[in-house]
Amino acid sequence: MKTPRGSVLVLLLLNLLRVSWAQSNCIRPSIPGIPGIPGKPGSDGKPGTPGTKGEKGLPGLVSHLNENGEKGDPGFPGMPGKVGPKGPIGPKGVPGPPGVRGPKGESGDYKATQKIAFSASRTINHHQRQGQPIRFDHVITNANENYQARSSKFTCKVPGLYFFTYHASSRGQLCVDLMRGRAEPQKVVTFCDYVQNTFQVTTGSIVLKLEKDETVFLQATEKNALVGIEGANSIFSGFMLFPDTEA
């Protein structure tokens, strides 16, 4: 079907008018559109230059804070601190009172008891010098060998209580000293008896607490009529009573 030539011309004219109208609209100012969405804040700018020094301020008010106030109430006790290190050992205390007496112990074995005893007689019949040990040269008994016949001295080897005795025959006055000690023995007792031109028997005894290495012996004095003959013997004896359990 053919289109009329007049219709085509009309269409061309309309297109030309539209183009010219559009061009005229582009030349004239347009109306502002709707504002867009605000953008994100920009990054911080660089620091500005220092400002000028300000003027001096006014003087401040005088404060009274340095004055001490009234004493406050005591605070609450604090928490206990940690346990400190162990201190040094203190001085030794005074001895306590004696304890109660313990029960009686069992019977001991008599065989285990120290056996110390001696007995020696004098067989020498010559004058004994003053200040010298009286010689008892003949050993009768010497359990544990604590008596030395050569020196006529008893030497303590086991500390304890000891009993000593002597029986001396004499013709005239007689005095003897019983001596004890270590390097320098001391006189303990003196036994004397006085008669003239007749036989007599003098005796004496003593209990001593001896320490280890102490000696015991009889010593002659200026009154010395001691004899040692058959029928008129002189004897020196001793034995331990009890050992010292604390030694």
Swiss-Prot record:
One of the protein's GO biological processes: synapse pruning
Location(s), subcellular: Secreted; Cell surface
InterPro entries found in the cross-reference section: C1q_dom (IPR001073), Collagen (IPR008160), Collagen/C1q_domain (IPR050392), Tumour_necrosis_fac-like_dom (IPR008983)
Modification Pyrrolidone carboxylic acid occurs at: Q23
Residues found modified as 5-hydroxylysine: K53, K56, K71, K86, K92, K104
SUPFAM superfamilies to which the protein is assigned, alphabetical: TNF-like
Transmembrane region(s): none
Signal sequence residues: 1-22
Described function: Core component of the complement C1 complex, a multiprotein complex that initiates the classical pathway of the complement system, a cascade of proteins that leads to phagocytosis and breakdown of pathogens and signaling that strengthens the adaptive immune system.
Domain remark in the UniProt entry: The C1q domain is the ligand-recognition domain, which specifically recognizes and binds the Fc regions of IgG or IgM immunoglobulins. The collagen-like domain interacts with C1R and C1S proenzymes.
Subunit structure: Core component of the complement C1 complex, a calcium-dependent complex composed of 1 molecule of the C1Q subcomplex, 2 molecules of C1R and 2 molecules of C1S. The C1Q subcomplex is composed 18 subunits: 3 chains of C1QA, C1QB, and C1QC trimerize to form 6 collagen-like triple helices connected to six globular ligand-recognition modules (C1q domain).
Identification of the protein by name: Complement C1q subcomponent subunit B
Organism of this sequence: Bos taurus
Highest classification ranks of the organism: Eukaryota, Metazoa, Chordata, Craniata, Vertebrata
